[in-house]
Amino acid sequence: MEDFFSFFDKPKDPLHFSAIRISVSSPEKIRERSFGEVKKPETINYRTFKPERDGLFCAKIFGPTKDYECNCGKYKRMKHRGIVCEKCGVEVIPSKVRRERLGHIDLATPVAHIWFLKSLPSRIGNLLDISLKDLEKVLYFEAYAVTDPKNTGMAMAEVLSEDRYLKALEEHNYQFEAGMGAAAIRDCLKAIDLDQLAEQLRQEMIEATSEAKRKKTAKRLKVVEAFKESGNRPEWMILECIPVLPPELRPLVPLDGGRFATSDLNDLYRRVINRNNRLKRLMELQAPEVIIRNEKRMLQEAVDALFDNGRRGRAIAGPNKRPLKSLSDMLKGKSGRFRQNLLGKRVDYSGRSVIVVGPELRLHQCGLPKKMALELFKPFIYNKLEERGFVTTIKSAKKMVEKERPEVWDVLEEVIKEHPVMLNRAPTLHRLGIQAFEPVLIEGKAIQLHPLVCTAFNADFDGDQMAVHLPLSIESQVEARVLMMSTNNILSPAHGKPIIVPSQDMVLGIYYMTRERHFAKGDGKIFASPEEVRIAYDAGEVDLQARISVRMKNILSAASEQPAIIETTVGRILLREILPEMVPFSSINKVMSKKELVNLIDVCYRLAGNKETVILADRLKETGFRYSTLAGISICMNDMVIPEGKSAIIDSANDEVKEIQNQYTEGLITDGERYNKVIDIWAKATEDIAKQMLDNLSKDTILSPDGQEVKIPSFNAIHMMADSGARGSAQQIRQLAGMRGLMAKPSGEIIETPITANFREGLNVLQYFISTHGARKGLADTALKTANSGYLTRRLVDVAQDAIITETDCGTLDGLTVTSLTEGGEVIEQIGDRILGRVALDDILDPVTGDVLVPANQEIDETLVKRIEDAGIERVKIRSVLTCQSRRGICAKCYGRDLARGHIVNMGEAVGVIAAQSIGEPGTQLTMRTFHIGGTASRHAEQTSLEARTEGRVKFININSVVNIEGHHIVMNRNGEVAIIDETGREREKYGIVYGAKIKFGPDQVVKPGETLAEWDPYTMPILTEVAGRVKFGDIVEGVTMEEQLDEVTGLSRKVIIESRDADKRPRIAIKASDPESASGGSTIGRYYLPVGANISVAEDSFVNAGDVIAKIPRETTKTKDITGGLPRVAELFEARKPKDFAVITEIDGVVTFGKDAKGKRKVIVTPELGEPKEYLIPKGKHISVHENDYVRAGEPLMDGSSNPHDILRVLGIKELAKYLVDEVQEVYRLQGVKINDKHIETIVRQMLRRVRIKEVGDTNLLIDDQLERWVFEEENERVIAKGGRPAIAEPLLLGITKASLSTESFISAASFQETTKVLTQAAIEGKVDQLRGLKENVIMGRLIPAGTGLSRYRNLKLVAEQAELLEPVAVAPPAVEEDYPEDDMLDDIEE
């Protein structure tokens, strides 16, 4: 009876295993797991549709086709359970065993498994040390392999061609044995003694002379070690029998019309069985060798096709000429098992409809159409109807719901009460793309969405659709309410600023009501209280924007301790009514633009908490909509005021362009310089017109009551929209009322002729034609961008998915030092913004008093940030994810604040995925190459000079300079800086100075704000002389190292250095002492080598002064600002690719000297004060940016080019690399105005740096050049040190995100990412065990993820009610769902 009830048991919970192992199957294992041998290729009988015996669908092997019924029909029903029918041999059991029972095919001859043969590197080839080509010759019966050399001196597994074999037989008198095909290879593999081979290979590695040999031996050793450790035998890579997949997994479905649809696998199996049976028959008949060989080769090919069709030779195609899908194809790619069914499951019941705006909803609500709610909540409604006694059976409940009786609607209202639903808008780029709301029933068929959550969903109401999902179990409802409710997601996880912020109309309304209007009705009145203002406004006595004074009770004036009288406007007092108590009036007593609203909500969240913020957000929404309606703002043609000075600016620009054209014609400048200057002139003209236009728009002139003309802030509609941040930008307005400006070609170059018209004037045909260029490119880019951005996010998620907060404090003493971010002397990001929400590493002390401002290990919150900024601290040491010592995962202290919640991060938070989403989500806003606005090119006029911003003394930092004739300092080195120091000695500004710049002020001279500090030519890289003297050319031979280039337009020529074939020729300019009587008497006092492409600026024998330009290297004509910008740049950084022309950097500090050229490369020698000098070879023609006797620091580039991240890591270490990567990625996002917190980028960089490469083995079991996880290496070292051995030494490795994902320790995660076959092949050989630590593996295995509420420590918690009365109000979910995970109650860890 027990046994009978077990039949109705629920399926078992998938939680009872803790790891999964993969390995190579032995023939015995295959046979042991099989339920019988498949002998015939037949499938089912075409008349009876019953499976053929011993065929591919045989019921005897795989189980009955119908539940509890044997094939011949003798035994039916449950009572015969477990009996084996004596007539047809079928066991009477449920038919679902046909999904799990394997069969097998015994092969007449062994065949090689194609994965181990062809998946590079070939594992069989590696073990036997045979090349893949030779191996294939043996396997496909074109050559022999020696299987037993006896004492002939031949090598084991030596490959012999047919002729060579026959010769050898005669030579060695038939003393050895050789064979063909997989059988021979199997014998060779069987003969391998792994221990002995491993020993031998280790020895070979020690003795290896060449690097290549060592690498090859290391690879072989790796394979041998893998087999040794895992207990797999090499000969198992050759199959003697093949497992047959259960028939339900390769179904045969009858279509109408008597045809069948079948899985490709059946065809593939059928070919194998046919060929196998034919081979058996031929062997029994003792057919000629050549026929048998051919049949064996065909069997090998059939098995290859079954395992991986198309891997070798042409893919076998089915009747419709389409390649058949093999077992490997079932796993691979987007439509394979991993990504289609295991990672991307579909939900079985959800709704979807168009969205419309629901302005009267509260923030936690969404409007759900009644029809949809009825369908989604069906089971709950049936349950309630039965409970209420309206119906007695489910069937009658169903009828009642179908008829939509009034009782049903009442029950529905009750069921949906406090039952959250989840709304999702595709594409879900970050976690805010799915949020929970409480449904409100509405008529109609569209879902209503709250306007404030649109930003998070990136939704608009032009026909977007959204999906509705219903959490069923109590636990999932709790999680939806506590973690996913829209009211709990006010802050963005990417940057910690509010994401629930009024936009568009709401912003406009609030902006309008907080503006001041001069001389409005009631201007200058004084009120006793805010309430009085409300009364006056309602009575129509004062205007909304009138400037008034009000006595505020809760604000005391500093002087008299009395309630202060505040100057404000009527609108701001009205806005104050919706403000929570704790938020000060000063935060809205200003013109509220969108930026101010973000700050307001932020301040409210910090001061008043979540609940008040939600209420405030809703009230702002209502107020905003109301007042934008009252404002009645619209736009018309006349709002676009074209500035009067426009034509004058354009005329003067045209004149300048003519002037430059003349200079070019006279040969004073090159074509490239001309192009750049022209572009600059127009860029500047556009800016000037835009500036004039904006000044015009932003000011109105009105008559004051006493008849004076007064300029006041404008109420121009277009200006208000842009100024408030509601819609539009300065650039768009510029195109409407200024001039459209320069356009770019699709290639990114800028077209010289700008569009001088604007949209209000209208474009002529030529201008319109030029416009289409940029506009079309924009559309093409958008399409490409979406796919690229999605792929970047996928790679990021994959690499970071196992970065989870696993402990509170790892106890590290290491961290990063953070300073303010400056660019060109401007502070782009204050130190406060960068350290907010991080944890201090050491005590932060006040530099003046020495008091502790922030104790070590404390989170730096808003108040502490203010304290640090006020104290003027410039460098702060903080804990960082990069230096976290946690072995698996990350600790909470190193991560700091959970940006979306505003407090230190919780245990189990999946910070890796959050980081990946935060970086990937704005990816679609990044550009593919260049940044356009409707195709107009934006390029800043190149900076050519530096102006001081403050008054102070000039200080040179690390500058070598010579003073030229005019008395200016000419900078002769790179990386020098100029600072301006105020009276107290503090640095007010600091600027990097380029080589060749003219500094107008000497050290310690005083500058005034606005004075020019330095100037330079941005378009050429000068080569300067440091000494005065006569010019002599060396190796500058026309036609060999130099050519005179004639400019067709100007008819003038210039001398340009070209690449010479003669390696000994090194074009140079020598400066000879001009005074023959002096000590140096005509000898060389300066020598300058010229790179390819340099233009010589001096004539031979002319006289030059110190600081003069002797040659110029033209810079590339500038494309739009960013060489590889946008998305490709971010991908390049995260993939850690070497840049195309990367700069060689020095690894040590020292003095530069030039050595003799070697192999056509220049030799640069860096000599340190102590120790060996280092030599660097630099390709000819590359410009060397250091000079003889310059002092360089480690990590400085010796030539032009971009930095190679691998070099930075090697030379400067992890922290510098992290700083470089974070800054570079941030720069791309900053250009687009996207905010991302540094810690997200750090998290990804940590994942890229998690492996090390072994340099010295010590006494460990590691191999040299082995790459492994850092913590595995640390554990191994600890083990060895504990025993008193020598630890191994390793260097950190920087892997790109794709590489890092593929090298995770979890083979399931790696296989589901890319290169599935390769990953699984390697894992099988190593007998890998997946401990299921990351998120992805657990999703694939169908378990809860080990993050958040799924952490193992919450797994076995039981929910226990304390008092009886607690039990009543909880809505009971239908039992069918609730008992799914009996021992797996989750508790929200929010209370933690």
Curated annotation (Swiss-Prot):
Residues annotated for Mg(2+) binding in this entry: D460, D462, D464
Keywords for the protein's UniProt record, in alphabetical order = DNA-directed RNA polymerase, Magnesium, Metal-binding, Nucleotidyltransferase, Transcription, Transferase, Zinc
CDD domains attached here? RNAP_beta'_C (cd02655), RNAP_beta'_N (cd01609)
Per the entry, the cofactor note is: Binds 1 Mg(2+) ion per subunit.
Per the record, its GO cellular-component terms are:
DNA-directed RNA polymerase complex
Q: Which GO terms describe its biological process?
A: DNA-templated transcription
Asked if the keyword Plastid belongs to this entry, the reply reads no
Enzyme class per UniProt: transferase
Q: Which cofactor does it need?
A: Mg(2+); Zn(2+)
Q: What Pfam families does this protein's entry cite? A: RNA_pol_Rpb1_1 (PF04997), RNA_pol_Rpb1_2 (PF00623), RNA_pol_Rpb1_3 (PF04983), RNA_pol_Rpb1_4 (PF05000), RNA_pol_Rpb1_5 (PF04998)
EC numbers, comma separated = 2.7.7.6
This entry's Gene Ontology molecular function terms read: DNA binding; DNA-directed RNA polymerase activity; magnesium ion binding; zinc ion binding
State the protein's purpose. Answer: DNA-dependent RNA polymerase catalyzes the transcription of DNA into RNA using the four ribonucleoside triphosphates as substrates.
What is stated as this protein's family in its record?
Belongs to the RNA polymerase beta' chain family.
- Name the UniProt record assigns to this protein: DNA-directed RNA polymerase subunit beta'
- Which species is the source of this protein? Geobacter metallireducens (strain ATCC 53774 / DSM 7210 / GS-15)
Q: What is the lineage of its organism?
A: Bacteria, Pseudomonadati, Thermodesulfobacteriota, Desulfuromonadia, Geobacterales
Gene name per UniProt? rpoC
